[in-house]
Amino acid sequence: MRGPHVRHIHNFACHCLGLKAYFREPGDGRLHPHIPAHDLVWAVVIGRILRESSFLSLEWLTHSPVRAELGIRAEFGDDALAYSTERMDPEATRAALAGVLRQAKRNKAFENSPFIGLAIDGTGAGRTWKEPCSLCDPIRDAKGEVHGSLHHFVMISVVGAGLTLPIDVEPYGPGDSEYAAAQRLLPRAARNLGPRFANYLVGDGEYATAPFLHSTDEVGLPVVARLKENLPSLAAAVRARFDGQPPHAVFQEGNDRVEVWDADDFDPWETLQWSTVRVLRYRQHKSDGTLVQAEWLTDFPVAKLGSLSFYRMAKSRWEIENRGFNDGKNRYGMEHICHHEPNSILIVWLLIVLALVIERLYRLRHLHRGDHQIRSAMDLLTWLWLTLGSRSPPETG
């Protein structure tokens, strides 16, 4: 077969993922545009796939001999990217991302997984010492002195389905919070994805509050949340029930032995409008001798969800940490602020998410058709750079 090439990724995104209309009209807010919006947006997306994280590096690419091979027609500078991202409507990119996820589901990208999960979590990125913008959260030492600023956002991502695919991000600044941003993000993402897209939502202990759990009910998603000491009455009841008791079941997960305790008749706390609460405690004995124990709560009844599936849903939360935040920061440039303006920061974060989704669907599904081996992210990156100046990629075995 022909090897991967940047032009193939562009065609895959436009035609297989249905993004042609989005790249033509990506929510451009410029009144008198001279540079096609397609070129500006696609430059950011393909630049992140090529691990080029600054607007200056994109300016260099658009003035290089490989501009046409990148699928970009016009030359432009970093100032054009800054100007356009300041004025783009983020809702157009959010809608496009949700459309890609729906198309991926129709294309059976998740067909080997019994459940499709959504994970939600927050992080900080883009430390700066520049004049603060409205999203800048001051970094203070123990004496209260400010040492730069950090930008924060909440992400929601597909997890537990064989592919980790981020869907949307919501920024929050001073006077706001991760919790409040998540409450804005969840209903929007659920609305954009449509009913019955996912089977559950998983989150850390910060989201184990009655208002947030009721919000998941409103969007029709069962929830799996970490149980910590922020719910003291339930945590005490779990200890009283499970401590000193033999495990209800023991599983072998890979090289790890997992003991579980599982009960679905705990009383809800005063403000939670559930009839009962189900809690799973797992004790994971890793092959290196380490021990991991945690408790998780859910509104899934035992009749619909076994203990092993409950355990796997809880563990799927780590996907957003490892394959969302860590990959986004270390590989796709989420830590780098291209243009220090709130809307531009948000747009670039959303375009990074789009680049990550396109790259993973192309590499892990499109290139993996038939009996072709899965390429690593680094292998694909190397191949794309090696073939960038060639209109005809070499054959691959």
Model-derived regions, located:
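Basic, short loop/linker segments at the boundary and entry of helix-turn-helix/winged-helix-like folds
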Residues: 2-42
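Active-site-proximal, Lys/Arg-enriched surface segment
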Residues: 82-161
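A short, flexible helix-boundary coil/loop motif
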Residues: 1-7, 19-20, 249-267, 329-331, ...
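Electropositive, glycine- and tryptophan-enriched low-complexity nucleic-acid-binding patches
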Residues: 140-196
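Short, conserved catalytic/metal-binding motifs centered on acidic residues
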Residues: 43-44, 58, 77, 81, ...
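Short amphipathic alpha-helical "interface-anchor" segments enriched in bulky aromatics
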Residues: 9-12, 58, 304-339
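Short, positively charged, Gly/Tyr-enriched micro-motifs
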Residues: 31-99, 216
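An anionic, glycine-rich sequence signature occurring as long contiguous blocks
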Residues: 224-317
